[in-house]
Amino acid sequence: MPAPRAPGLRGGLARARRTLPSPAATPFAFGYALLLLATSLYADYGDPDTVDALLQGSSTDVAHLSTAPVPTIFASALWIAGGIASPYAVVFIFVLAALERRIGGWRTAGVFLLGHVVATLATEIPVALSVLAGHLPESSLHRLDYGISFGLMATVGALTGLLAPLFRWTTLAVVAVLLVDDLLDMVEPLAAWGHPIALLVGLACWPAVRRVGPGASRG
């Protein structure tokens, strides 16, 4: 009689659950995921005029960054461009939790925020300068730009520094192909340039995250 497979199945399910955020193991990723779920559901089912006003107010365009930079930076990271079904949302859940397990919640939040801020400023400051120089119209100061993708790319970059070499370089190769494809298409120029900048921010965090390393105390 063949041996029962239930224990193996249970072990597989347990391993799968460990990759997801949880309030005990990864409180930052878990709480942030719930927050993004709430804002995504509201974006889908809330009053359209109110949703539009909130998204406009959360946009990290030059107009908002020049008048209220800090609130705008944080507000823009409360929404997922494309909603909860976006590929960014799916990858976000696993990547953020994986990094938090290795370096703790506060450090993970710092990596995410650093990538979000640096890539945003690196793409918006040239827009402002181009408008001042007369190379772009003033309408370029007002755009709808929000989401978690810059922070996510920085998190991916930092996480790869803690992976085994095979997984590290395979992941970076796949991400590089996707980023080059975006640069060639140039559907969203600022996002296309911002994503590799954010990834480089994450790669620059390798020395810091490696000093902490897997198994470090949370915080």
Report each predicted region and the residues it spans.
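N-terminal signal-anchor transmembrane alpha helix
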Residues: 11-56
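Aromatic-anchored segments of alpha-helical transmembrane domains
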Residues: 36-41, 116-125, 174-187
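N-terminal TM1-TM2 helical hairpin plus the immediately adjacent luminal interfacial "cap"
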Residues: 44-98, 105
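Hydrophobic, membrane-inserted alpha-helices
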Residues: 72, 90-97, 152-158, 174-184
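Membrane-helix interface "capping/anchor" motifs
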Residues: 100-108, 158-171
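Hydrophobic alpha-helical transmembrane segments of integral membrane proteins
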Residues: 105-135, 199, 203
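Membrane-interface micro-motifs in multi-pass membrane enzymes
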Residues: 139-159, 194
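Loop-to-transmembrane alpha-helix initiation sites
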Residues: 187-202
